[in-house]
Amino acid sequence: MILTENLNVLWASVLFETLYRLGLRTVVLSPGSRSGPLAIAAAAHPHLEALPILDERSAAFFALGLVQQQGRPVALLCTSGTAAANFYPAIIEASLSHLPLIVLSADRPPELRFCQAGQAIDQVHLYGHAVRHYRELSLPELPLLPYLRQTLCHSWQTALWPDPGPVHLNIPLRDPLDLRSQANFHGELPKGFFDQVQPFVPPRVVTSLPWQTWQQMQRGLIIAGPSHGVDPLAEAAAIDRLSRFLQWPVLADALSSARGLPHGISHYDLLLRDAHLREYLRPEAVIQLGPLPTSKALREWLSACDPLIWCLDPTGDNNNPLHGRCQMLAIAPQAVDCPPDPLPPNPYLKDWQDQDQRVREQLKRTFEAIDWFSEVKLIYHLPQWLPSQTAIFVASSMPVRDVESVWQGSDRRHRFYFNRGANGIDGTLSTALGVAHRGQPTLLITGDLACLHDTNGWLITPQFQGCLTVLLINNRGGGIFEHLPIRQFDPPFEAFFATPQQVDFSYLAAAYGIPYHCLKDWADVEAQLRQTPWPKIRLLEFRSDRHRNAQWRQQVLAHLGG
């Protein structure tokens, strides 16, 4: 449907029709005047879902969640001025996580900039190097509609290939900014105007791999970082084929699709805290898939061992924070074609599996003896208690580290989502809502500070269609700081690092009309989590003692691997 009341709405209509034909299905927009024609066109398009969200920062992270869930670009629209600046944190996350995002910022025309006209800032290259591509569109003109179409096609392609990420289109508009008819205006498109607008298909890149070298290695590892791919099952199957052929163990981040594979080692983070095992399990070669896992113990061990590393990653990122002996190979795991016949069984693989099983049994005995509200025990039991195919969004900071340490793979096909590009806590709730919107029933695991940092996310509730359970681990402060050397210095530790908040979450939930439940004991925790999915949104509060949990991690968990 092309609107033709005036030049601006025609321009905006052509913009969204072009993006729709390229593959766009969702537009997330925040209200404003200068973006009026664009909002009108998005809302009027019969095949686009247009979602109005008040707060721009929350809207941008919600869009990131949608991109992760849908596996395709989402458009993000705002008016001129500081509105666009509020998109910046999410754009940084999209850039570092290789998530394609189409950022559309309306702007004042050139004659209303730098003259105190109001609601005008310098939006040219506003996001700097965080975007893959920037274009300022011309002011709307009928003869320039083919230029608009081609600019959009190129921008869409750049968002997807060769390195997926955000692109920014700055769109200046003069009045009228509404549906008023324009005198003597006849906006008709030529026949077949959209005929060549087709979804972009990235080319397949073939990279030769050092199979002969790998087959000669007796102590090889596959290390899989967090999965940013849109098809985790295909990625997991590819990693499984590679590990079965080479007979190498797989050390997979809990946020990877490969955690729980037959050759997978779930508890490497605990094993590598033991000095004897660090030497006993020393590798000579590593195939690294994407970025390194979160585990500090793993990173320190690899740095000390200095094995030969081949990093497989199609994005071209420098995934070598240890500055080791690493060769970069621009290929995704799914594109690896393994030779047909697997190698003989490898004693190095069995060593890893035996140690992993020993720790698995030790964890089971340890948690059976705990009756107090242990945050790590909560994470340990989630794979058993959550229904099959639950999507899980894990907040940064302490939750993701506990997941890394004790999450055991299962056959329930849980899929993880996360914001691990910049590793910030901002936008946690909003991103989780985006993941759950019209998607799988979702569980958000978050601490109290991450949840409070994004309370405007609750404003999305009226537009939200889906099932989200927020599992709030409330230890009244930043639990991760308890594990840093600064903990020994109080003051200033408690006030300036732990930053405890005194919010009653039952009142916060009531203010937004969110069902709330404070978990009472372990039987209650299990019963509530087995009820997932829950209609719409609910908040479960797990109250824990920050100091006791930190002390237990340091005195007990850290020594379970030995």
From Swiss-Prot:
It catalyses: isochorismate + 2-oxoglutarate + H(+) = 5-enolpyruvoyl-6-hydroxy-2-succinyl-cyclohex-3-ene-1-carboxylate + CO2. One of its GO terms (biological process) is menaquinone biosynthetic process. Its cofactor is Mg(2+); Mn(2+); thiamine diphosphate. The keyword Secreted does not apply. One of its GO terms (molecular function) is 2-succinyl-5-enolpyruvyl-6-hydroxy-3-cyclohexene-1-carboxylic-acid synthase activity. Its EC number is 2.2.1.9. NCBIfam families: menD (TIGR00173). Catalyzes the thiamine diphosphate-dependent decarboxylation of 2-oxoglutarate and the subsequent addition of the resulting succinic semialdehyde-thiamine pyrophosphate anion to isochorismate to yield 2-succinyl-5-enolpyruvyl-6-hydroxy-3-cyclohexene-1-carboxylate (SEPHCHC). Homodimer. This is 2-succinyl-5-enolpyruvyl-6-hydroxy-3-cyclohexene-1-carboxylate synthase. It comes from Thermosynechococcus vestitus (strain NIES-2133 / IAM M-273 / BP-1). The gene is menD.
